[in-house]
Amino acid sequence: MTTLEIKNLDVSFGEKKILDNLSFTLDSGQIAALLGPSGCGKTTLLRSIAGLIQPDAGTIRFGKQLVSLSSLSLPAHKRKIGYVPQEGALFPHLNIAQNIAFGIDRAAFTKEQIKQVVKEMLMLIDLVGLDMRMPNELSGGQQTRVALARALAVKPAIILLDEPFSALDAQLRAELRTDVIKLLRTQKTTAILVTHDREEALVSSDVVALMRDGKIMQQGSPEQVYSSPTSATTAMSTGD
């Protein structure tokens, strides 16, 4: 079943077109790796899906729900989207429990239910006992885990990860990536992972989408994309 369907998406900033007639689909439970050079529109695509940018044209559909301009301002828990920006972007003035609980719909849950969700998330990311710590008291890897828990706490239909491991050293990056992907698989969460790392895409994803100049140039399994680039542009994007 298709969870995400994007058709003919255009986004411009001033005179500069960032996304150019972009189309993309992702099935339920799949993890997609989004690769491409800096400035090709990867983050803009995620922010458009998350409702943080209003596209100039095109459609974004989650299952049967068409995301319209009027729905873009809805809270993340109502749109069922989890978003982890680069370096996690935790709220520095909130403790870990408050960060995790931030996006939960307080109209739909009691305080005790919210506490239970936070407890479950802390267990899920292996940070039990750190709920009262402040973000600056955590390591980079721990902050990334908390950002992931905050996104998962809203029970998203899809989670968007914008280079979540980029600030970490190679060993920690590999360890945390393994843990995060395992967590997403366990939760059967549909996800898009933005990365510059070809190896990361190969070991983490079911689908690789290569971007250049605001377009998806090629989409397929990691093996298909890396073994059979369809154009010189695609070959450049894969490093071949």
Indicate residue ranges for each PLM-predicted region.
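Conserved ABC ATPase "signature" region
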Residues: Q65-L69, E112-L130, K182-R185
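ABC ATPase NBD coupling module
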Residues: V67-G82, R106, K111-Q116, P229
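Short coil-to-helix segment of the ABC ATPase nucleotide-binding domain corresponding to the Q-loop/switch region
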Residues: L94-G103
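Conserved ABC ATPase signature
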Residues: M134-L138, Q142
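A short, proline-enriched helix->beta-strand linker immediately N-terminal to the Walker B motif
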Residues: A153-A157
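ABC ATPase "signature
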Residues: Q219-G220, S228
